[in-house]
Design a protein with these regions (language model features):
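Protein kinase glycine-rich loop
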Residues: 26-32, 37
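Activation-segment/catalytic-loop signature of the eukaryotic protein kinase fold
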Residues: 88
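Conserved beta3-strand ATP-binding lysine motif
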Residues: 51-56
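Protein kinase catalytic-loop region centered on the HRD/HxD motif
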Residues: 128-138
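AlphaC helix of the eukaryotic protein kinase fold
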Residues: 57-76
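Conserved short submotifs of the Hanks-type protein kinase catalytic core
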Residues: 92-105
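Activation segment signature within eukaryotic-like protein kinase domains
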Residues: 122-123
Length: 302
């Protein structure tokens, strides 16, 4: 006899963590094969996003392992541009992540091209996060607009989410990805090879192109073979070069087919982006505002 599949909680309900806190569920923000995400309030009325993993028809232990892997990675990888996990727990056959509440995904902003200033600022934050992952020997493997969350404020803050298929390199040059969306495949992955730190730069190049132009550089309507052909033939890089813009020129290097001809790190990409007039002028102005403190002259005792 099989155990009944647990039901996802509903808006207006509550979930208690084994650690004690009770989380009150608000509206459902999204759902998918994994489960659902809710607005929620914490025990001190803090605003969180509650991600619920539902076993469904998959083996319980398999879903539990995925949930625990993502939870432990988010808990370990603390960075201002990576979504913060506040709590994670298992209750009544379901698995929960209590996450930092963001306002929306980057995907919801991509109806039109961004200003160059916004492209560079969002790229800066994402490159900062990708560099942090690389420094900690991780490849994200799933960099796209739906996995970038945005916090509104005086300036927009971008945060990477969903480390479920990220891979730890353990000092190796690459790792065989378990799954990668076809439209996100770097040439080395499309050829059946390994994800490397440069593979994340390729995926980020696709995303920066999309922010810069408002369209994705790969035609995803042509099926798997057509998508792979575009990646193999270097179509994304050619499109970036054809833009004839400073941002497009930098993106074209990120999208080179051979890893050794791409940038070597996210920091190296940023070193080129920050030289662009649209950012460097602002940088000079902000630097000029930093106060200079003169040391006090030494005093005589007595």
């Amino acid at each position: 006899m099989t155990s009944p599949i647990p039901a996802i909680p509903v808006s207006g309900g509550a979930v208690r963590s084994p650690r004690g806190p009770i989380y009150l569920l608000g509206r459902r923000l999204g759902s998918g094969a994994f489960g659902a995400v809710f607005d929620c309030l914490g025990p001190f009325d803090q605003s969180f996003a509650l991600k619920v993993f539902l076993p469904g028809n998959r083996p319980y232990e398999e879903v539990r392992a995925e949930w625990l892997k993502e939870a432990e990675r988010l808990y370990r990888l603390r960075h201002p541009n990576i979504v913060y996990v506040h709590d994670y727990f298992e209750a009544a056959g379901l698995f929960y992540l209590v996450l930092e509440r963001c306002d929306h995904s980057l995907d919801e902003m991509l109806q039109a091209p961004f200003t160059d200033r916004l492209v560079v600022d969002m790229a800066r934050q994402l490159l900062f996060a990708v560099q942090y992952l690389a420094d900690n020997e991780f490849v994200h493997n799933d960099l796209h607009a739906g996995n970038v969350l945005v916090v509104q404020g005086e300036r927009l803050t971008a945060k990477l989410s969903d480390l479920g298929i990220a891979q730890e390199l353990y000092g190796y040059g690459g790792a065989k990805p378990s799954i990668v969306q076809h439209r996100l495949m770097s040439p080395e992955v499309a050829a059946g090879g390994y994800s490397t730190k440069q593979s994340d730069l390729y995926q980020l190049g696709l995303l920066i192109y999309q922010m810069h132009t408002g369209v994705y550089p790969i035609d995803t309507t042509v099926g798997y073979d057509g998508i792979i052909a575009q990646i193999r033939d270097g179509v994304p890089r050619a499109k970036a070069e054809a833009l004839g813009t400073p941002i497009g020129d930098i993106v074209s290097v990120m999208l080179r087919r051979q890893e050794q001809y791409r940038y070597t790190s996210a920091l190296q990409v940023w070193e080129d982006l920050q030289k662009l007039d649209v950012w460097s002028r602002d940088r000079v102005e902000r630097t000029a505002e930093i106060p200079v403190f003169e040391p006090l002259p030494p005093t005589q005792n007595g």
